Amino acid sequence: MSPHLFLPVVVLVVSPTPGAFQDSAVSPTQGEFEDLDCGRPEPSSRIVGGSDAHPGTWPWQVSLHHGGGHICGGSLIAPSWVLSAAHCFVTNGTLEPADEWSVLLGVHSQDGPLEGAHMRSVATILVPDNYSRVELGADLALLRLASPAKLGPSVKPVCLPRASHLFAHGTACWATGWGDVQESDPLPVPWVLQEVELKLLGETACQCLYSRPGPFNLTLQLLPGMLCAGYPEGRRDTCQGDSGGPLVCEDGGRWFLAGITSFGFGCGRRNRPGVFTAVAHYESWIREHVMGSEPGPAFPSQLQKPPSEPWEPREENCTFAQPECGKATRPGTWPWEAQVMVPGSTPCYGALVSDSWVLAPASCFLDSLHDFETWRVLLPSRPEEKRVVRLVAHENASRNFASDLALLQLRTRVNLTAAPSAVCLPHREHYFLPGSRCRLARWGHGEPAPRSSAQLEAQLLNSWWCHCLYGRQGESVPPPGDPPHLLCPAYQEEEEAGACWVDSGWSLLCREEGTWFLAGYRTLSNGCLRPRAFSPMQTHGLWISHVTQGAYLEDQLTWDWGPEGEETEKQTCPPHTEHGACGLRPQSTPAGVLWPWLTEVHVTGDRVCTGILVAPGWVLAATHCILRLGSSTVPYIDVYLGLAGVSSLPQGHQVSRSVVSIRLPRHSGLRPPLALLELNSRVEPSPSALPICLHPEGVPPGASCWVLGWKDPQNRVPVAAAVSILTPRLCHCLYQGALTPGTFCVFYTEEQEDRCEMTSAPPLLCQTEGGPWVLVGMAVRGSRELFAAIGPEATWISQTVGEAHFLHLGGSSYWSPEGSDPCPQDLAGSASSPKVAALPLLLALLIPR
C-alpha cells in the first residue's frame, strides 16, 4: 500500500491576520481546576457536506498552527493537554520540534478573534513508539502546553472514554474542523469552524467497504484502534486540514472524544468512510503520559451500556452504495443531455452534472449578451424549460481549447430521483482502461447529421498509442493515475463513404460497470473525419466541484489494468514527421498486436504479396510480386491491414481497400523493383493501420534491422528475422557481376528456420533506440539476402504520394546503397551468392554497431 495515495496529511495553510491572536496567558488559580468538568458546551442551537458551527458549540476544538497558519485540529482534554494526530507532527519518521507549534484555543473563525480566544505555545509533543504511518495505526499525539489554557464558555475540555466504553454502531456523532470543504477545495474566508454529522460504522461493515478496490485501486485492512464514521453513499466526511480534530459522541449529557480524525481515501467518496483513531483503545497510553498533571483529563464512567451490537452482514454479503449518476436506459438516449437555447443562436448541447448545473462549451456563449432571463435549458422527459441564473466560464476558456467549458446554474433544481439523471464525472486520478466501451454524444453547437449507432461506438486506445499518435513530439506518456493529456477512441466501424463530421462538436462518454462517465469533449472535428483526440475531463473535476458544490464526481469502477497499465510508465513518444506520426510500435507489444504498417496485398489469381503502408492512401510493394513478368494486364488488387494471420487484431481493426492505380518509377531499360499502390480511400490512423517512416538515406546510425514477412505463407503469421547490413564493399565483392544498382545485402543473425518465406517479397525495417521504425528496402526477386533500397527512390515516392513520412534521424548513415570500393584480395572471385564458408569472414569484416 502506497502511503502517498492516502489523503490525511494536510496541505492547506490558512493564514489569519498576523497578530490577530496574542498570547494573553493568565495563570488560573488552583481553585478553577477542582472537579474538572468535561464535555459540556454552553447551551446552543445547532467540512465535506458540513455547515458553519455556532460559536461555543464545540469549546474543546483547537487549531494547531505551524509557520503562521492552521495545519491540523486538536481537542483540549485538560488545561495543559491537547490530543491530536501523530501524522501532523511526524515527517519522514522524524518528530518535528515542539517549539515550532502553537495552539489556538476558543477560536471560531480563523479570520478574527472571539472573546476568550487565546494562544499557547507547545512545550512537548508525544507520539506512540509504534507509530510509523497512518494506515498502520497508533495515529495520536499528546501536546503539553507551555502554560495552562484559560477555561471559559468558549474553552472547555472534552471527556475521554475509558477502554470499556462502547459506542453503538449507527450512533450519530459530530466531526469538526477548518479543513477543505471538498478535495483540494479550501474552506473560504472567513474560515468559520465547520461541523458535520457522521454515523459510526461497525468494524465488519467498514472492513467490507474497504475490501473492495476503490479510489487509487487500494484496499485497507482495519487494525485495532481504528474507528470508521461516515456513510456508504459518501458526500459527508472530514478532509485535509481536519486531521487531528475531534469526532465526538454524546452519551448521558456529556460529549466524549470517540475518535481523532486520521485519514481517508479521498474525501466524501462513495463506500469510503473516514477512518479515525479510536481514543478508548489508547486509554492506558494517555493516562501513562499525563500522569501527575493536576488536573488531568477526565474519563467519566459510561452511565449505560448500549444494547447488544446490531447484526452486521458478513463481509462477503455486504451491500455497497451504487453510483447515483450516469444511468441510461439505452446508449444514445442520454437523460443528462441538455439543450441550451440562447436567442439568435443554434442550440448548444451540454450535460447535466448536478441537480442545479449544466456543463457546456464556453464558446457557445462567449459572444452572447448575458441576458439570462431569455435563456432556456431543455432536458429530456421534462415538459418544462429551466431558466438560467448564472454562467461561470472556465478562466482559460477564451485562450485554451482544452478549457472550453462553462457551467450554467439553473434557477430551480432538477428532481434527480426521477429522470433525468446527471452524468458522472471522473476524478483527477481516474484511468479509463484501454478498450473501455465509449460512445460519441452531441456537444456544443450544430445539429449533427443522423449517424448509425455503430458509427458512434468506440473503444479507448491505450495511453501510449493515444499520445504518440496525436500528442506533441517527444512528450512523456502519463502513467495510470496521472491525468492524461488526451483521450483517443478507436472506432468499431469504418466511416461511411462521403460522411463528414465537421459540422458539430462531440463529447466522449465511457461506460464502467453500467455507469456512464463524461470522459472527454471536442468542440470541433478535424476535417471530415470523426474526432480522434478528446480533451480529458479529469483535469477539470476540481473546478467543476468547486463551482457547483454538488457535481457527481464518481470513483473509478473498473481496476483491471493488466499489462496495459505498466506499458506507459516512463515512456516518451518518438519524433513525428511533418505529416504526423509514423513507424510507431510499443516497446513491449502484447501477443497478437503486430506491425501496423504491414499489409496483405491480394492480387488476382490468389497471389499474396507483402505491402507496406507509406501514407494514408498508399502502399509500397515489390514490383515483381505485384506484376507478372511479361504481363501487360493490370491485375485486380485488394489490400488488407490489421490482420494477424487468420484472426483480427483486438478492438476489431480490420481495414480493407481496393487499389485504383499502380505507379512505377521511370527506369531506363530495367524493370523498377518498387511499386506504389494507390488506394480507393484513405486509411484512418490506428494502432493496426499506421504508415511507416521512410529514411531517405542508407541505414540510420546505430539501428537494429529486421526482415519482416511471413514464415507460413498459408496462415501468414508475421515473423521478424534479425539481420546485419553488409557494407557496399562486401556486398559488391560477394555478388560480383550480379549486383543490380540500388541494391544491398544483409546477413541473417538467426537460424535458418526463423527466416521469412520470400515469395511475397518481404521488407527490411530498421529502428534506432527509442525511435520509430523506418523502411529501408524491399526484397529482390529470388533472393533472401538482396534488397532494393528505398533511398534512391525517395524523390519519386515524395512526388507521387505527397504525404510520405520521410524522417531524417540525424547523423551519417554508415553505408550508402551505391559503392564500388575494390574487393579485398581474399574475397576476389567469390561466387554470385554468399557461401557458407565465407560467413565467418563476413562477420569479422562487418562494421561494429
UniProtKB/Swiss-Prot annotation:
Pfam entry (one): Trypsin
Propeptide intervals in chain numbering: 20-46
InterPro entries linked: Pept_S1A_polyserase-2, Peptidase_S1_PA, Peptidase_S1_PA_chymotrypsin, Peptidase_S1A, Trypsin_dom, TRYPSIN_HIS, TRYPSIN_SER
Main location: secreted
UniProt keyword annotations, A-Z: Disulfide bond, Extracellular matrix, Glycoprotein, Hydrolase, Protease, Repeat, Secreted, Serine protease, Signal, Zymogen
Active site: 87 (charge relay system), 139 (charge relay system), 243 (charge relay system)
Disulfide-linked positions: 72-88, 173-249, 206-228, 239-267, 348-364, 438-510, 466-488, 500-528, 609-625, 705-766, 733-745
Glycosylated residue positions: 92, 130, 217, 317, 396, 415
GO terms under biological process: proteolysis
Modified how: The 3 protease domains are not proteolytically cleaved. N-glycosylated.
Highest taxon above the source species: Eukaryota
Protease keyword on record: yes
Keyword Hydrolase: yes
Listed GO CC annotations: cytoplasm; extracellular region
Subcellular location(s) of the protein: Secreted, Extracellular space, Extracellular matrix
EC number per UniProt: 3.4.21.-
Job of this protein: Serine protease. Hydrolyzes the peptides N-t-Boc-Gln-Ala-Arg-AMC and N-t-Boc-Gln-Gly-Arg-AMC and, to a lesser extent, N-t-Boc-Ala-Phe-Lys-AMC and N-t-Boc-Val-Leu-Lys-AMC. Has a preference for substrates with an Arg instead of a Lys residue in position P1.
Family, per entry: Belongs to the peptidase S1 family.
Domains as described in the record: The first serine protease domain is catalytically active, whereas the second domain lacks the essential His residue of the catalytic triad at position 363, and the third domain lacks the essential Asp residue of the catalytic triad at position 673. The second and third domains are therefore predicted to be inactive.
Protein name: Polyserase-2
Lineage: Eukaryota, Metazoa, Chordata, Craniata, Vertebrata
